[in-house]
Amino acid sequence: MTDFDSLPHEEQLPLLLELANAALGAYDLPAGTVAKMLNLSENATYRVDAPDGRRFALRVHRDGYHSRQAIASELAWEIDLRRTGVVTTPNPIKGRDGEIIQDIAHPRMKRPRHVVLFDWETGAEPGIGEDLSGPFEVLGEITARMHIHARQW
């Protein structure tokens, strides 16, 4: 059996989806909850839809990209940004074991992957040709607040 890392990209995607759906079992979610890939870059990001109408985002971290400690530090900062009202960040969801970061194994992958489930944050992509000067002004203000927070954190 070919190792995950040696597989072509198009053969890795279904295995990542298997891992994402397996990860849902680590959380208190109803049967029938499913993941659907949204994006693949450094990490794989999935939209998770529960049959009761709740929606989440699941992040499957790329193997070896960030340590568990680095992910925990990022999450602690995101939680504090939200708590202090600096910026709205997605709320991470604790697993059944009480931990935010879950380690999920797949038989075709060398090591378990770090996985984090977040509450869904609604939004919309800008339209093609849309004037983005207003949204970028807001983004600049948010970035400034985050910079100040990071210097004091």
Write out the residue ranges for each language-model feature.
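ATP-binding glycine-rich phosphate-binding loop
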Residues: 27-50
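Generic, low-specificity signal for short hydrophobic/alpha-helical stretches with a mild N-terminal bias
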Residues: 2-6, 27-30, 40, 60, ...
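Short hydrophobic/aromatic-rich motifs at helix boundaries and adjacent loops
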Residues: 14-18, 47-51, 114-116
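ATP-binding pocket architecture of kinase catalytic cores
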Residues: 51-153
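Generic hydrophobic secondary-structure packing signal
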Residues: 16-19, 41, 70, 139
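Juxta-kinase regulatory segment immediately upstream of eukaryotic protein kinase catalytic domains
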Residues: 1-35
